[in-house]
């Protein structure tokens, strides 16, 4: 069994009295999810997440301390993938899309995220993010 490790984040911004999250639509599979990618070399989890968010969307982030949500799943036969997600506030809002992998990037209200996200794991992450943001 092969193991893979990726890191990413639920990226948010505050707009008036609302919170919006950043979602991406992948060209491969057409699913909506959060920015993430494989750990390279001796990168830390945060370094990987920061690099992947910037590469895929052009967004710089600041991580929320204390939020770390691991997810494990099997994307294909004989592969187990561990993904660590963080919660991060966007420092800029203009997209620069990684066109090789991403077809769309969008800000959506956090309360509408369940309608867009393809996978149940991501819907669970939104619940955790909402809970953490309420405590801030």
Annotate each PLM feature.
Residues 22-25:
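Short, acidic/hydrophobic/Gly-rich beta-strand patch recurrent on exposed beta strands
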Residues 128-136:
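C-terminal alpha-helix
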Residues 37-127:
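Unchanged
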Residues 31-34:
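Short small-residue beta-strand/loop micro-motif enriched in glycine and branched aliphatics
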Residues 1-20:
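Conserved N-terminal beta-strand and adjoining loop/helix that marks the start
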Residues 17, 29, 113:
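Surface-exposed, flexible loop/turn segments at secondary-structure boundaries
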Residues 10, 27, 111:
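Anionic group-transfer/hydrolysis microenvironments
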